[in-house]
Amino acid sequence: MIVIEQILSKQDVGAYRQQLAECPWGDGRKTAMGMAASVKNNNQADAQHANVRQLANQLLARIGETPKIVSAALPHKIFPPCFNRYNETEEYGYHVDAAIMRIPNTSEVIRSDVSMTVFLSEPEEYDGGELVIATEFGQQQIKLPAGYAVVYPSSSLHKVTAVTRGQRIAAITWMQSMVADVTLRQTLYQLDQSIQNLIKANNTDRAELDNLHNVYHNLIRQFTQL
């Protein structure tokens, strides 16, 4: 589980919220697969609406140009982002994301390796509505500032708790990673982040940094699937 700080600025969030307020919304259960439909109770912006498609494309572009997301997920394919809304009493019970997803209006499918939530509501705007992810270390609760995101393995059992006050708006998407194995992907992320931190510190011999870069990229060559 990795937090991405300010993938969207406050101004971006305001623009997204304004446009989403003018878009049609429907019952989120219509897009749920299998057992997830029975525990899903939220609303989802109409993915076919022109404004929703435009926002989704803008977010796709932002994902691709955010180095920390690229490092953490090593995305090969990205599902078009969806926008969901939880009003008071609405929730999404424990579920696991579908392993295979078909991209709407295409014949293309992706394997969901990495899930991402981008928060579009400030924490003080609503009570409840925490994203809860079951991990080997217990339940992890996430409630981040608007514009922040969290990425986590799609294999994780997770839920969104009931909103008891206000409204929770977020964007969600899924990625097929070039590295399917979650442990290997996390190790590559840690290595890359260590290299980036050494570069920022500016006190490491250039030859050593070149060697580390060489190791990282050769591991990428060895383990990625395209």
From Swiss-Prot:
Protein's GO biological process: DNA damage response; intracellular iron ion homeostasis
Cofactor binding description: Binds 1 Fe(2+) ion per subunit.
GO molecular function annotation: 2-oxoglutarate-dependent dioxygenase activity; iron ion binding; L-ascorbic acid binding
Residues reported in the UniProt entry to bind 2-oxoglutarate: R168
List of residues binding Fe cation: H95, D97, H158
A family per Pfam: PKHD_C
Key words of the record: Dioxygenase, Iron, Metal-binding, Oxidoreductase, Vitamin C
Protein origin, superkingdom: Bacteria
E.C. numbers: 1.14.11.-
Domain Fe2OG dioxygenase: 77-177
Enzyme class: oxidoreductase
Cofactor(s) named in the record: Fe(2+); L-ascorbate
Protein name as it appears in the record: PKHD-type hydroxylase Sfri_0612
Species for this entry: Shewanella frigidimarina (strain NCIMB 400)
